[in-house]
A protein has these predicted regions:
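Membrane-embedded helix-loop-helix hairpins and adjacent transmembrane boundary segments
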Residues: 1-496
């Protein structure tokens, strides 16, 4: 089982939803006067939009397909991923958001993460900008690819069309509104998509539980056929648990999430956004975990077959609801895919347009030209990600985990040290980025045969050690300590 029975209501809901997203892109097309408008929405995003946009762009199709699939296969042991992510997101909002917002707006007008690194360490040679830009492009191409795979699997299962055709349709929709609308379009669509995703992850598990005859009945069935799925620890090692919890480390280095902190309307909006964002996340993660866990019981009770565990949400949406509701629920997967891929495309395009073209190759480029370059970059990055996504057997979770580790190791430690340690230097930042990224790449290829731990763990540790060692053996550049003190004063002023 895996193909949805094609019907007019399902097709209608998909078309309506896609047209709504494209309309938002067209609406904001003429509102983008500057690169700050296009990339940060003129720093005018309120707490609700900032919170839900951060959540929706963070989770992607992984939330509705990858995570439920992992719980379906491995049970509660895989819920450690959700726990790690929740803790990481909370720490990110509480400790990183305010400081990064101050640094990128009050102290310096930084539009991109690479911008921030350059101004934070007074890097007049643009080395940090170039390294971070390369890291962003390399890992985001894989990350965007995971979203395109999710979208393709959705269209393939929904419409029964060939994978490559499904991939083309999903890519075209995502690229279109990102190309036109920029950051405001992405954030407003994220608001809609975030609410739709959470609603779907509340409704589907509840209806599943009702059809099973209650949670107790579902657990009873699982205990009979697959009891190991009910254990948080059984059948797993300490290394596996550490690997799952370590997903939380990735939050500190995700450019498409960090940029939400940079664009929020006011520093005083951060606490409210934190409550909204974490509440959305916890509810959505619980829903995804419950659906994946109880999916085993449902499939067994009603004598069904499921070829691809990552399609459990698609199958449940088809079986439990009428076609109109199914169309809405399946649009939630499209929403998840679109929200993340569009954010990542936008960050990638800003990297090419701002960090390469406008800073290195044409410093006097007019704003309109930079925006043209950024829109062309959206197309270019999407084409490369599309090519990688043509492997229909690729696991959504495995692609996401690789890119997540890459950003967490190369940027996460640098972001944390740069915001909390005034003694950190430009050389330390360079060493941290290079060692973190290279450790993830090399460990993924060669290290797992020695110790099968999630590559973000060694990557984050190596990067942190490199930052401390190289910073202690190099000097702090003029002005950086003063800027750090200014940031601390701004933080202190918020308490009064």
């Amino acid at each position: 089982m895996g193909h949805v029975v094609l019907s007019t209501p399902i097709v209608t809901m998909f078309v309506v939803y896609s047209l709504l997203m494209l309309y938002i892109g067209f609406y904001f097309y003429k509102q983008n006067e500057t690169t700050e408008d296009y990339f940060l929405g003129d720093r005018s995003m309120g707490p609700v939009i900032s919170a839900l946009s951060a959540g929706a762009s963070d989770m992607s199709g992984w939330l509705l397909m990858g995570l439920p699939g992992a719980l379906y296969v491995g049970g509660l042991i895989n819920s450690h991923i959700a726990i790690g992510l929740s803790l990481g997101a909370l720490i990110n909002w509480v400790f990183v958001a305010k400081r990064l917002r101050i640094y990128t707006s009050v102290i310096a007008n930084s539009i991109t993460i690479s911008d921030y690194f350059e101004t934070r360490f007074s890097d007049d040679k643009h080395i940090l900008r170039l390294i971070s830009a390369f890291v962003i492009l390399i890992f985001f191409i894989f990350y965007i690819s995971s979203g395109l795979v999710s979208g393709a699997k959705l269209f393939e299962a929904t419409f029964g069309i060939q994978y490559n055709y499904a991939l083309s349709i999903g890519t075209l929709i995502i690229v279109s509104y990102t190309f036109l609308g920029g950051y405001k379009a992405v954030c407003w669509t994220d608001l809609i998509q975030g609410l739709l995703m959470m609603s779907a992850l509340i409704v589907v598990p509840i209806v599943m539980i009702i059809h099973l005859g209650g949670i107790g009945e579902g657990i009873k069935i699982i205990r009979e056929i697959k009891p190991e799925n009910l254990s948080f620890l059984q059948g797993s090692s300490v290394i596996a648990i550490i690997s799952s919890l370590a997903w939380g480390l990735g939050y500190f280095g995700q450019p498409h999430i960090l940029v939400r902190f940079m664009s929020i309307r006011s520093i005083r909006d951060v606490p409210k956004a934190t409550v909204i964002g974490i509440s959305w996340m916890v509810i959505s993660l619980i829903g995804a975990c419950v659906m994946g866990l109880l999916g085993v019981a449902y499939v067994h009770k009603f004598d069904l077959s499921l070829e691809d565990p990552e399609k459990i949400f698609i199958v449940m949406s088809q079986l439990l609801f009428n076609p109109w509701i199914t169309g809405v629920l399946l649009s939630a997967i499209l929403a998840a895919v679109m929200s993340t891929a569009s954010s990542q495309l936008l960050v990638s395009s800003s990297t090419i347009a701002e960090d390469f073209y406008a800073t290195i190759f044409n410093k006097n480029a007019p704003q309109k030209l930079v925006m043209v370059i950024s829109r062309l970059s959206v197309l270019g990055v999407a084409c490369i990600a599309f090519f990688i996504s043509t492997d229909r057997n690729a696991s959504i979770l495995s692609i996401v985990s690789y890119a997540w580790a890459g950003f967490g190791a190369s940027f996460g430690s640098v972001i944390l040290f740069s915001l909390f340690w005034s003694r950190m230097t430009r050389i330390g930042a360079i060493a941290g980025m290079l060692s973190g990224a290279s450790t993830v790449i090399l460990y993924d290829k060669f290290g797992k045969s020695f110790l099968d731990i999630y590559e973000i763990v060694p990557g984050f540790i190596v990067a942190s050690v490199a930052i401390v060692v190289f910073s202690l053996f190099s000097s702090v550049r003029a002005g950086t300590k003063e800027a750090f003190e200014t940031m601390l004063k701004e933080i202190e002023s918020l308490k009064h």
